[in-house]
């Protein structure tokens, strides 16, 4: 059985790329096809993977223009025909367009339908731009949506990364998912992190911690405004296009601290010292919330999306029900981290360990390789 792995692109090392590394561990002989690859942005282990790029990788200034070039996925992937009985795509956008050989299977592990295309990134459209830009954006979006739905029809079977994404695949593509396999989280590096909260975890004198890309849909604005209102300490790690707005919301409040882009080791240290991890956005899965629980820390999350699959209410965290400052502030006022057992948090995190992911995905792929398409 010949297999080929397809990944949208390799220009940033995030959760999707960590998932790719685990899929490669299952089928190390399978070639990995991707739009483009910037090796200097990835751990050395990626240099040993059988990565094959499209013609886009040969375009000029790929390092600077990688995000722009990602819009070429419909052209680049539509012409890709790997010699494999089973195509396994790890896709949000273009990778699901690859056609298998005649009689072959295309099994898509779907992270999400593209956020930028289906209005899933609140506050990131072009509605504030001048009319000609809006018109171009509308025309391009309509074309890309039609193409995205056609690409989804090339998939034999979908596997969703969460129940939340399963429902999104059904709503946008009209397709069912044959399995749900939660993505892998490297929990081992957090499990033995010493707690450095120094006895303040149960009161309001300890700090709250959040880490995320600074984008509007992450809703860090709610965390900032709620903590300012209550006089609670908040430490935020990350960078992104929303930084200027978030800093304006924080003003000169000394309780709100921006840490910038910090190392994984520093993130782990910050988590170990907090009294709770804030997770205020509507997320597809919730990798950072799992990492926080692996540190033995409870999570305060917006009660929708992937958070409902990664956090156990009253056991490893608590939810606020509306995406408003008032709702989050009310939850923060009633929250006491001494109500949560760190061992329960760590046990929950272990459900998403890489070995469990590899076992579950291998089982799902093996079954679906023998089944006819929809």
How should these model regions be labeled?
Residues 29-96:
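Active-site donor-binding segments of glycosyltransferases and PAPS-dependent sulfotransferases
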Residues 126-158, 166:
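Membrane-proximal helix-turn-helix segments that form the acceptor-binding/catalytic region
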Residues 194-218, 224-235:
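Conserved donor-binding/catalytic core segment of Leloir-type glycosyltransferases
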Residues 208, 272-284, 297:
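Acidic donor-binding loop of glycosyltransferase active sites
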Residues 244-266:
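Nucleotide-activated donor-binding/catalytic signature segment of Leloir-type glycosyltransferases, i.e.
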Residues 298-301, 311:
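Short hydrophobic beta-strand element within catalytic cores of glycosyltransferases
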Residues 313-314, 318-325, 332-339:
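Conserved acidic donor-binding segment of nucleotide-sugar-dependent glycosyltransferases
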Residues 323, 337-366:
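A charged, aromatic-enriched C-terminal amphipathic alpha-helix characteristic of glycosyltransferases
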